[in-house]
């Protein structure tokens, strides 16, 4: 039993030869026609014995089957069913049919036998029997008629080879071909259309057994000729006829009118050149170019033509036509002299300038090369002169000595000796000369300092890119390039050579990759000059501002009206005094009167609250500060003209305990009778409830003055026991009732109205009390005589000191005229007027009434005036319990019939906007309101909540939209040009169109409102000189404010960097340590800023502290991209609707994009007069964009800088500038 060996195709199925064989088999294995199937039925009988023999051989385990014993054709002829299936199947189907028949035969003969088709196939992978197979039926019949002795066991069967595909027989019908179709005939009659189509059989022959590919019949099909397009291939665009230049309609520069000639001899005169090129047109200018340094000709000539009306008796010739003709005729074969020239068109002179620059550069290079060659020739000649003659004897080496022995010269020849090689050890310390260059230092204690050591050290460190090696007495300095590469090279040299030997020494190195750590950068001369200029400018501006302020002060002093200033000061003081007087004289007594327990007796009785003890008499009273001092205070003040005569308005009213409350028979006491000393008055704490003075008042102003006057210093009219009844009762009546007040004749005192009233009351009261004890007439005469004597003494004193009696009273809105009167004053007070007084005992009420009748008999006070005052002062206090406000009286308008012509009562204005104010203005009376209600009957009510709150909210919204406008309006809420109507009626039907930047600028109501407010403020400042002076003073004060300098900060940053570098050297060197310990100086120097809404555009950046000029503010950070990527992103931003792109160019190839990744520096707006500038600096070898201050910037000032967009002259949509500064250019581009 043998096994077939695997072939080349099994191991290399993808080999080209194997693939070609497979393609060949596929072309051969094509389905056969039905005609061949009918011819094969006759061969069935002959095919059966063959198949029987094949199966017997397989069952006997004989030799393996090959293609010669059992062919695929014989197997296919066993039965009609198998033949039909085989004609439509592939080679694999034939092979499977054969194997199934054999396997079925083996399984029927020997049940315990396993047949294998392949060496790796058994019964588990493929079942031995298969139902309903025609091959099984044939195999069973054959096996039943034969008796074959086979041995039991597993006999592996050889896999039959792949049979070749069955080819079709020659002469068989392959198909049908339509040769006549009446439907497709164009010129056919109705009879011909009735004919039937004719078909012709396609017979298979030897030539067309494998029909050729019809596509190969197309010429050059493999080269693409089969899919030719109808379009014509055009390797170059059409050559169109150029349009003639028209200066009136063409935009841009015209055709060139100038040519440049090169290639001629530089020594050629200008005459032949001019003669040659003047034949083409009139020459306007000819220029033979020369070297600007040496003045020699370069062989380059520029010829510029001009338009001529008639050239050499002919027609007009344009300058462009003459230049074009000269270019086309002289560019190839034209010669000047013996050289061929070259002519080029030169529109703007750029070509000639390029030729001149190139020629000058080549001449410079040629001169340098010639100079070097001459120097080499001279050196060679000098060496040859010093060589010995050829016949001189040679040395032992057989070569001439390169360095001949020269005798030491004597005398004058000693001057021609070469100087001695200078020592490499420098006397000046090198460390002070190194600024920022990285270096490595080797101290002299490790390697001795010698000049001969420097070349050896250079050779030792030749693997590193050092810039220079220098030495002084302290040691050696290996200096590297001042860049990031130099720093890395310094670190690499330190790592590889530190503590390594140099001859017999050890190189103990000290690395400084960031230069001299103790170096402090001094300002450059340019910066010093710039600072000096700025300082001089600031001083000049300061002097000018000072001069302007002084001039303004002098002008104001000239224009100042003293009367007006005095009037202003008086009005201001009157207002302050009136406020304090109202607090002390009206508010405080009214509050105390309201808090009187007698007023609330009915309420306590209703609520069942017991009466407090001691309510019969008030335990405290308010003693007026203007009534307690003696009446001669005016005299004492007049005698001291430089002392303050104004009484302390801000002092609190003095509250003291009333004495002798039980006495009702108080009489006028004798002036010789001394009163007992007063006890220390106790001041209750509830006086703090009265805010009668400011918080900033001093303690002396708030302290109540004590009554320490002696009795002798008082006038007789004031020497009384001073009971609380007279002070509280009568004084309050005079104040509350608002009675007219006059001053007695010859008083010579500055008194308030209540003081005069109290003096008169005290006089009458004392006389009345004294008359109860002594005879009334005697008491009156005695009292009158004493009073007259006192007044005479006071008048004499006033005349002695030259003081005129003046009485003033300052009350807001009321002018009180003090007139000296020498008549008796009578007052008739009705019972209704007295009923408003506080409730007191009968005795006190009687005394008060008598005093009033005695002192005021001549003045009639009607009950209406008293009632009005009572309503204005006391009624609000009574209405607190009832919580109801009285409605003020409204002015009524009386309407009458017009006399001349009929006129409407009210002219309705249709332009008024019908908002809340508009409706209130429209409705004039109750009739209008009634009609409005009738109109709104059919409408449902709106739920607006609280009506008052809703009305207040509507008016607040109106105030926000129309600041400063009150009442009805005649213009709608909107911005001019904000709402643009659509031509089609709706925005959705407009389509896509570009919105101009000028129109976008109108969509900034916030900016427009701020701009309007700014313009109004500036206009008011211009009209008001006081505001201008205040603003100038504020600017001057802001300049004097000390601003923090960043010099100390930079010094601290340098020290911190040095410490970090020292720590980096001490740490183990690993990848990434440098990035972890990298120090960003820009973050440490950043100023505190914030972003907020800007009046210029959208968001803005504001300073949070004062920033000095030339200080760094912030770094502009973002994503670093190339220029091509930035252009692509800008287009994407425009398409996606991002209105603002934050692209900042660093150089020609790099752009910072902060649109989606960046800091708050991108919010800085543009201004034509900015306060900042952007600079590009290098930090650690990389370029950064940093914003610096151009001038001193105050806190909360917006930061701006100039965007510096390129000017777009031919742009239809320029970006408008919204900065609003005085130097605004109007557009960004």
Swiss-Prot record:
The gene is set1. The keyword Methyltransferase applies. Signal peptide: none annotated. Residues 80-93 have a biased composition (Low complexity). One of its GO terms (cellular component) is chromosome. This is Histone-lysine N-methyltransferase, H3 lysine-4 specific. Component of the Set1C/COMPASS complex. The lineage of its organism: Eukaryota, Fungi, Dikarya, Ascomycota, Pezizomycotina. S-adenosyl-L-methionine binds at residue 1203. Catalytic component of the COMPASS (Set1C) complex that specifically mono-, di- and trimethylates histone H3 to form H3K4me1/2/3. Binds RNAs which might negatively affect its histone methyltransferase activity. COMPASS recognizes ubiquitinated H2B on one face of the nucleosome which stimulates the methylation of H3 on the opposing face. Belongs to the class V-like SAM-binding methyltransferase superfamily. Disulfide bonds: none annotated. Its EC number is 2.1.1.354. Residues 26-44, 375-387, 523-541, 691-715, 784-796 have a biased composition (Basic and acidic residues).
């Amino acid at each position: 039993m043998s096994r077939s060996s695997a072939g080349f195709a099994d191991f290399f199925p993808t080999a080209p030869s194997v693939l070609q064989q497979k393609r060949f088999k596929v072309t051969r294995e094509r389905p056969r026609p039905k005609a061949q199937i009918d011819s094969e039925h006759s061969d069935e009988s002959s095919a059966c014995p063959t198949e029987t023999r094949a199966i017997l051989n397989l069952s006997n385990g004989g030799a393996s089957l090959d293609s010669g014993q059992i062919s695929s054709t014989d197997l296919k002829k066993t039965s009609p069913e198998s033949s039909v299936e085989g004609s439509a199947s592939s080679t694999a189907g034939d092979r499977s049919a054969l194997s199934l028949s054999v396997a079925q035969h083996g399984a029927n003969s020997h049940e315990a036998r396993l047949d294998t088709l392949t060496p790796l196939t058994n019964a588990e992978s493929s079942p031995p029997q298969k139902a309903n197979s025609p091959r099984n039926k044939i195999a069973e019949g054959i096996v039943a008629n034969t008796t074959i002795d086979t041995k039991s066991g597993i006999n592996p069967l050889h896999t039959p080879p792949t049979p070749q595909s069955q080819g079709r027989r020659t002469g068989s019908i392959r198909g049908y071909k339509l040769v006549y179709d009446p439907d497709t005939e164009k010129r056919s009659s109705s009879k011909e259309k009735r004919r039937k189509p004719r078909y012709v059989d396609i017979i298979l022959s030897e030539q067309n057994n494998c029909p050729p590919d019809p596509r190969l019949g197309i010429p050059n099909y493999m080269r693409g000729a089969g899919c030719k397009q109808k379009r014509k291939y055009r390797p170059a665009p059409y050559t169109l006829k150029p349009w003639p230049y028209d200066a009136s309609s063409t935009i841009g520069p015209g055709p060139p009118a100038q040519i440049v000639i090169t290639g001629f001899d530089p020594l050629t005169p200008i005459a032949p050149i001019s003669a040659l090129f003047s034949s083409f047109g009139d020459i306007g200018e000819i220029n033979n170019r020369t070297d600007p340094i040496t003045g020699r000709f370069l062989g380059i000539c520029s010829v510029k033509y001009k338009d001529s009306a008639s050239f050499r008796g002919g027609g007009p010739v344009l300058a462009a036509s003459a230049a074009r003709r000269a270019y086309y005729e002289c560019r190839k074969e034209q010669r000047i002299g013996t050289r061929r020239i070259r002519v080029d068109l030169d529109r703007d002179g750029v070509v000639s300038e390029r030729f001149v620059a190139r020629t000058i550069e080549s001449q410079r290079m040629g001169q340098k090369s010639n100079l070097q060659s001459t120097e080499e020739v001279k050196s060679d000649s000098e060496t040859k002169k010093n060589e010995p003659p050829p016949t001189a004897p040679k040395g032992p080496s057989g070569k001439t000595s390169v360095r001949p022995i020269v005798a030491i010269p004597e005398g004058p020849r000693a001057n021609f000796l070469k100087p001695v090689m200078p020592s490499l050890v420098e006397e000046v310390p090198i460390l002070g000369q190194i600024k920022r260059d990285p270096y490595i230092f080797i101290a002299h204690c490790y390697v001795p300092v010698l000049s001969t050591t420097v070349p050896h050290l250079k050779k030792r460190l030749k693997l590193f890119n050092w810039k220079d090696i220098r030495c002084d007495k302290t040691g050696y300095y290996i200096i590297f390039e001042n860049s990031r590469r130099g720093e890395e090279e310094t670190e690499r040299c330190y790592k590889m050579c530190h503590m390594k030997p140099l001859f017999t020494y050890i190189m103990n190195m000290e690395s400084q990759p960031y230069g001299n750590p103790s170096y402090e950068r001094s300002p450059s001369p340019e910066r010093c000059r710039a600072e000096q200029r700025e300082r001089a400018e600031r001083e000049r501006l300061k002097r000018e501002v000072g001069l302007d302020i002084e001039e303004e002060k002098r002008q104001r002093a000239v224009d100042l009206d003293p009367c007006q200033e005095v009037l202003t000061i008086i009005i201001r003081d009157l207002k302050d005094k009136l406020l304090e007087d109202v607090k002390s004289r009206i508010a405080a007594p009214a509050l105390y009167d309201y808090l009187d327990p007698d007023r609330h007796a009915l309420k306590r009785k209703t609520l069942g609250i017991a009466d407090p003890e001691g309510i019969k008499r008030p335990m405290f009273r308010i003693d007026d500060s203007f009534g307690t001092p003696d009446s001669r205070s005016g005299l004492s003040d007049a005698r001291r003209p430089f002392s303050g005569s104004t009484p302390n308005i801000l002092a609190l009213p003095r509250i003291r305990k009333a004495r002798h409350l039980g006495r009702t028979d108080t009489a006028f006491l004798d002036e010789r009778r001394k009163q007992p000393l007063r006890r220390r008055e106790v001041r209750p704490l509830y006086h703090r409830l009265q805010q009668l003075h400011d918080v900033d008042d001093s303690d002396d102003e708030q302290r109540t003055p004590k009554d320490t006057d002696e009795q002798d210093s008082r006038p007789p009219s004031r020497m009384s026991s001073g009971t609380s009844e007279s002070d509280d009762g009568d004084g309050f009546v005079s104040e509350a009732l608002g009675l007219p007040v006059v001053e007695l004749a010859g008083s010579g005192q500055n008194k308030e109205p209540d003081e005069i009233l109290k003096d008169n009351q005290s006089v009458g009261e004392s006389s009345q009390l004294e008359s109860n004890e002594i005879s009334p007439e005697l008491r009156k005469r005695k009292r009158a005589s004493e009073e007259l004597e006192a007044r005479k003494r006071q008048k004499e004193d006033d005349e002695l000191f030259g003081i005129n009696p003046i009485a003033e009273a300052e009350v807001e809105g009321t002018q009180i005229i003090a007139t000296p009167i020498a008549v008796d004053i009578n007052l008739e007070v009705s019972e209704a007027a007295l009923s408003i007084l506080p409730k007191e005992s009968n005795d006190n009420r009687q005394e008060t009434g008598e005093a009033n009748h005695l002192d005021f008999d001549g003045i009639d006070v009607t009950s209406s005036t008293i009632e009005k005052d009572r309503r204005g002062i006391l009624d609000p206090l009574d209405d607190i319990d009832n919580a109801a406000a009285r409605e003020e009286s409204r002015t009524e308008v009386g309407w009458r019939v017009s006399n001349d012509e009929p006129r409407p009562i009210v002219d309705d204005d249709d332009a008024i906007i019908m908002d809340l104010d508009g409706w209130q203005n429209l409705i004039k009376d109750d009739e209008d309101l009634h009609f409005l209600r009738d109109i709104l009957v059919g409408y449902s009510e709106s739920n607006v909540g609280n009506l008052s709150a809703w009305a207040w909210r509507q008016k607040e919204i109106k105030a926000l939209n129309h600041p400063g406008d009150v009442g009805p309006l005649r213009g709608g809420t909107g911005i001019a040009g904000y709402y643009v109507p659509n031509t089609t009626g709706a925005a959705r039907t407009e389509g896509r169109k570009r919105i101009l930047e000028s129109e976008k600028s109108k969509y900034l109501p916030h900016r427009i409102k701020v701009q309007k407010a700014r313009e109004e403020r500036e206009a008011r400042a211009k009209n008001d000189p006081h505001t201008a002076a205040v603003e100038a003073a504020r600017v001057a004060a802001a300049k004097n404010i000390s601003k923090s300098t960043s010099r100390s900060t930079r010094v601290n940053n340098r020290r911190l960097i040095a410490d970090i570098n020292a720590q980096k050297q001490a740490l183990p060197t690993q990848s990434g340590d440098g990035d972890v310990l990298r120090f960003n100086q820009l973050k440490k120097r950043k100023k505190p800023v914030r972003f907020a809404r800007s009046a210029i555009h959208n968001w803005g950046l504001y300073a949070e502290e004062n920033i000095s000029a030339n200080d760094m503010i912030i770094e502009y950070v973002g994503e670093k991209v190339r220029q091509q990527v930035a252009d692509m992103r800008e287009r994407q931003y425009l398409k996606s609707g991002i209105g603002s792109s934050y692209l900042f160019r660093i150089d020609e190839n790099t752009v910072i994009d902060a649109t989606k990744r960046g800091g708050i520096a991108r919010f800085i707006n543009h201004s034509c007069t900015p306060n900042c500038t952007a600079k590009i600096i290098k930090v650690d070898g990389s370029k950064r964009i940093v914003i610096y201050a151009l001038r001193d910037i105050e806190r909360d000032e917006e930061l701006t800088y100039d965007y510096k967009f390129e000017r777009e002259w031919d742009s239809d949509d320029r970006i408008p500038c919204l900065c609003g500064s005085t130097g605004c250019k109007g557009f960004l581009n």
